[in-house]
Amino acid sequence: MRLVFAGTPEPALPALRRLLDSPRHEMIAVLTRPDAASGRRGKPEPSPVAREALDRGIPVLRPARPNSPEFVAELAQLAPDCCAVVAYGALLRDELLAVPPHGWINLHFSLLPAWRGAAPVQAAIAAGDIITGASTFRIEPALDSGPIYGVVTEAIRPTDTAGELLARLAVSGAELLSATLDGIADSTLTPRPQPAEGVSIAPKITVEQARVRWDLPAPVVERRIRAVTPNPGAWTVISDLRIKLGPVRLGAASDLPAPPEPLPPGAIHVDRKSVWVGTGSDPVRLGQIQPPGKKFMNAVDWARGARLDPAARAT
């Protein structure tokens, strides 16, 4: 089939590369979000998908308004048979969806109808799910609600961050998307409607929502931190400094003894080998932390240099 690939960030690259290397399909263009400011100077940079396409000599489409009549007409001129989508980053309206005869086939990183929305991997980790996966489905106007072509499952490891889990799903999902498009081309796949039961929503996580709530139970705190690692990144405030946090360890999973006395939520205990913070249940041990303007470092090394007030709290 003649394909247009729509995607923007790094996790879309395995699928793009898999389809570019497929002898079954012809990639006629790549659709991605406009260049965005990056780095300290704020210089506009092409998306990871745009860079890959340009390196491969594939035309790149970067409309600011993909649903505009002008772009709908431009896409129609290309006459794609199908459009494959992985984390494009914009909602698509009926006029655009109607252009390719085989529709727009999306790779979504959850087992639909669970975790529809922009942050399915983060939501699955935060919820304590032990199994997740990826689904291919035909895009309809309602959010992630179209009929499903195929799924692949993936176990969530106890220490998985969102970045680590997403990297695995991007690879297994690339194979699923390729197989789905092959089946559509061969007329051997029939999509099935999503069940009405089991629907859950995973909206984008804001920076403010990534602030750690130390009043929650320790297992919830630990999962939530992994769920926003590396983006947008967990953070807290200690001694008026905004500190980014890497994954933490639960007391039961730590190889070091917990503080001798219970810690109220947000209270900090520093000993020779560890930094502990109280939660709504048991304390957690900090691992890597990032003070303002510095790189990630061991929490103990930072605490020694910072000379924390004994009354300092994480808030």
Curated annotation (Swiss-Prot):
It comes from the Bacteria. It is an enzyme of class 2 (transferase). Keywords: Protein biosynthesis, Transferase. Its EC number is 2.1.2.9. GO terms for cellular component: cytosol. (6S)-5,6,7,8-tetrahydrofolate binds at residues 110-113. InterPro entries: Fmt, Formyl_trans_C, Formyl_transf_N, Formyl_transf_N_sf, Formyl_transferase-like_C_sf, Met-tRNA-FMT_C, Met-tRNA-FMT_N. One of its GO terms (molecular function) is methionyl-tRNA formyltransferase activity. It catalyses: L-methionyl-tRNA(fMet) + (6R)-10-formyltetrahydrofolate = N-formyl-L-methionyl-tRNA(fMet) + (6S)-5,6,7,8-tetrahydrofolate + H(+). Attaches a formyl group to the free amino group of methionyl-tRNA(fMet). The formyl group appears to play a dual role in the initiator identity of N-formylmethionyl-tRNA by promoting its recognition by IF2 and preventing the misappropriation of this tRNA by the elongation apparatus. NCBIfam families: fmt. Belongs to the Fmt family. This is Methionyl-tRNA formyltransferase.
